[in-house]
UniProtKB/Swiss-Prot annotation:
Protein name: Photosystem II protein D1
Record text on subunit structure and interactions: PSII is composed of 1 copy each of membrane proteins PsbA, PsbB, PsbC, PsbD, PsbE, PsbF, PsbH, PsbI, PsbJ, PsbK, PsbL, PsbM, PsbT, PsbX, PsbY, PsbZ, Psb30/Ycf12, at least 3 peripheral proteins of the oxygen-evolving complex and a large number of cofactors. It forms dimeric complexes.
Principal EC category: oxidoreductase
EC numbers, comma separated: 1.10.3.9
Cellular component, GO annotation: chloroplast thylakoid membrane; photosystem II
Residues that bind pheophytin a: 126
Gene source species: Tupiella akineta
Positions bound to [CaMn4O5] cluster: 170, 189, 332-333, 342, 344
Site keyed Cleavage: positions: 344-345
Length: 353
């Protein structure tokens, strides 16, 4: 009997490319989102490094007073930054080919817009890639949902806030001191510390840190004993072993006695959902707060609302914050305007001594 073997027709180059992109056997999963993520993030990182080292000063306020941000122009790691695109450009799309020369593009802060736009695309695609890999492995999609919190925060400070304020020059500078400057000016102009959504974000971040530390220390301490009481419990384990070492019943009992019974989770899924949801929801709220303050819906300002029976103002901590805000607003962008908006109003605010 003769067997005839037919050679399978070689698949096309495109089919092989599609198979490689979507394969979960690769050391690093690429995915269709990765096809966009990889070049955009590489572009953002490359331009950031070059600009941080060598970019010339940028006319951020659009008043012909360039601000230096790179290492070669006198900065160090702490003071250096990618200076935001000039106020003279506003919200206009400003790629290299829109400028008369590369020198003009650099002077007007073109690299900032290039980095921010590519970075934004890259992190959105990273989130999509998380979902895509979860989908291909038959997992649920909550990893990408959790990652949406930092994506929302970055979108708020780099995209939404400049749109609301009318210029990319109001975006957050890409550097340490620049970030602090952004925070101080944001407080001066929007009173973010008195915004409930920022308060929820603080509770989310600090609460998440606390719960993470509590959970990690409790799991590390709740070992299933493999030794006699005369030996160290640690002697029964090897670092990185595959066998389960954690007893949730013991951990639940410990924590229930330390605080009270219902403060402790006895269900692992409920516990880990809580650990994920607490900081994620807090950061969502902060991003939402930044996005509303972008359009000048600001934090609470009680405007010296506590008065005695004679109508005299009784200063509260809120009034002290207001006074600090005025000082910070006076000091920023000193040459861009004669008076900050708050101080240029018809009636000067009373500070009562």
């Amino acid at each position: 009997m003769t067997a005839i073997l037919e050679r399978r027709e070689a698949s096309s180059l495109w089919a092989r490319f599609c198979e490689w992109v979507t394969s979960t056997e690769n050391r690093l999963y690429v995915g269709w989102f990765g096809v966009i993520m990889i070049p955009t993030l590489l572009t953002a990182v490359s331009v950031f490094i070059i600009a941080f080292v060598a970019a010339p000063p940028v006319d951020i306020d659009g008043i012909r007073e360039p601000v230096s941000g790179s290492l070669l122009y006198g900065n160090n790691i702490i003071s250096g930054a990618i200076i935001p695109t000039s106020n003279a450009i506003g919200l206009h799309f400003y790629p290299i080919w829109e400028a008369a020369s590369v020198d003009e593009w650099l002077y007007n802060g073109g690299p900032y817009q290039l980095i921010v736009c590519h970075f934004f695309l890259g992190i959105c695609c990273y989130m999509g890639r998380e979902w895509e890999l979860s989908f291909r492995l038959g997992m649920r999609p909550w990893i990408a949902v959790a990652y949406s919190a930092p994506v929302a925060a970055a979108t708020a400070v780099f995209i939404i806030y400049p749109i609301g304020q009318g210029s990319f020059s109001d975006g957050m500078p890409l550097g340490i001191s620049g970030t602090f400057n952004f925070m101080i000016v944001f407080q001066a102009e929007h009173n973010i510390l008195m915004h409930p959504f920022h308060m929820l974000g603080v509770a989310g971040v600090f609460g998440g840190s606390l719960f993470s530390a509590m959970h990690g220390s409790l799991v590390t301490s709740s070992l299933i004993r493999e030794t006699t009481e005369n030996e160290s419990t640690n002697a029964g384990y090897k670092f990185g072993q595959e066998e389960e070492t954690y007893n949730i019943v013991a951990a639940h009992g410990y924590f229930g006695r330390l605080i009270f019974q219902y403060a402790s989770f006895n269900n692992s899924r409920s516990l880990h959902f809580f650990l994920a949801a607490w900081p994620v929801v807090g950061i969502w709220f902060t991003a939402l707060g930044i996005s509303t303050m972008a359009f000048n819906l600001n934090g609470f300002n009680f405007n010296q609302s506590i008065v005695d029976s004679q109508g005299r103002v009784l200063n509260s901590w809120a009034d002290i914050i207001n006074r600090a805000n005025l000082g910070m607003e006076v000091m920023h962008e000193r040459n861009a305007h004669n008076f900050p908006l708050d101080l240029a109003s018809v009636e000067a605010p009373s500070i009562n001594g």
